[in-house]
Regions:
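Donor-nucleotide binding loops and adjacent catalytic segments primarily
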Residues: 1-79
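Flexible loop/turn segments at secondary-structure boundaries
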Residues: 24-27, 53-56, 88-89, 107-109, ...
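Short hydrophobic alpha-helical runs that function as membrane-insertion/retention elements
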Residues: 45-47, 100-101, 122-124
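Acidic, glycine-centered active-site loop in nucleotide-sugar glycosyltransferases
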Residues: 60, 95-96, 116-121
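A donor-sugar binding/catalytic signature common to diverse glycosyltransferases
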Residues: 65-114
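C-terminal amphipathic helix plus adjacent low-complexity
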Residues: 131-180
Length: 180
């Protein structure tokens, strides 16, 4: 974890993390509206972007970083607002943190619907951002005991899968099939 981000995390309550992936160079409005919504709820915010020049001036309760390790960061977040890419979604699930997905393209809308169906969060159309609706969705997700419970359960399930053992067993079976 970058030292300055670590200091920010230690200095207060769990933040809302906003990230839209590494390819979002023209998402200033999306970053600004999501940060405003979280700040309006009295939440601290971490914005991850490689293009900080697209952001408005943010208050001290917001931290902007070019990069952070998602797993360790997400496990310390109250909510992750993101684009719905499968890698980001998986890291948030593993961290046991609720999610609000803003799906733009590709597999992101499907990932958003699956996430909602499993009770791990919700989604919002990034092309129809409204501060009031974002605030309401964030508040509902943050206040939901059902979502928190589902996120904790899914994270626990991921920890207990021992994927490396399953992969090794599958490879052994495959190799044994070739030698038979």
């Amino acid at each position: 974890m970058p030292e300055d981000l670590e200091s920010f995390l230690r200095a207060g309550t769990a933040p809302v993390v906003v990230t839209l992936g590494s390819a979002m160079a023209q998402a200033g409005k999306v970053f600004a509206e999501t940060a405003k919504a979280a700040l309006a709820l009295g939440r601290r915010v971490v914005v991850l972007t490689r293009h900080p020049e697209q952001l408005p001036t943010l208050p001290p309760e917001a931290f902007v970083a070019h990069w952070a390790p998602l797993g360790p960061l997400f496990s310390r977040a109250a909510l992750v607002v993101h684009h719905g890419g499968i890698g980001t979604t998986a890291q948030a699930i593993a961290g046991g943190v609720p999610q609000l997905i803003l799906p733009f393209a590709h597999d992101q809308p499907d990932n958003a619907h699956i996430l909602k169906r499993h009770g791990l969060g919700d989604f919002h159309d990034p092309h129809r951002l409204r501060l009031g609706r974002l605030k309401a969705q964030m508040q509902a997700i943050l206040a939901s005991k059902e979502i928190a419970k589902a996120c904790a359960k899914r994270a626990q399930m991921n920890q207990n899968t021992h994927g490396e053992v399953l992969a090794a067993d599958s490879l052994e079976q495959l190799v044994e099939g070739f030698s038979a």
